[in-house]
Amino acid sequence: MIKDVKVVDLVPRIDDRGYLIEILRASDEHFTKFGQVYLVGDMTRNTIRAFHVHKVLWDWFFISHGSAKFALVDDRKDSPTYKEINTLVVSERKPQLLVVPPGVYHGWMSLEDDTQMVSTASEVYNRENPDEERVPYDSFGYEWSVKFK
């Protein structure tokens, strides 16, 4: 696993009314600070949103509906996992929070129609000077297709 990337298992609290899942708390060891929360939805499966990286911003990703394949590439030259590539699948069926530190390129592909992701960022998005560098989805030689197993 890329250094500082975390996959946190979340525990649904279930009773006769339904369920509640705590996604992120200020007291969590993987929380740094709050900037903003936004919802991203993909209407059709196989929609790819990749790649970008931040210099300062931390991301916390939670799939609230459907499932997604995430690709992560460590671009931090001083990291012991520099250039390492990780693939992770996050799904509503096994609630998890994906923690992505600055300096790690990341992207995702929806695996189901109407996949929805709640994304929390440590910084407020600055439209005039965004903390992001974007590269094409086929960068790093990454293969987005789903392999038959």
Which stretches of residues belong to each language-model region?
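Non-catalytic, conserved peripheral segments adjacent to functional cores
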Residues: 1-94, 112-149
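Short beta-strand His + acidic residue motifs that chelate non-heme Fe in jelly-roll/DSBH
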Residues: 98, 106-111
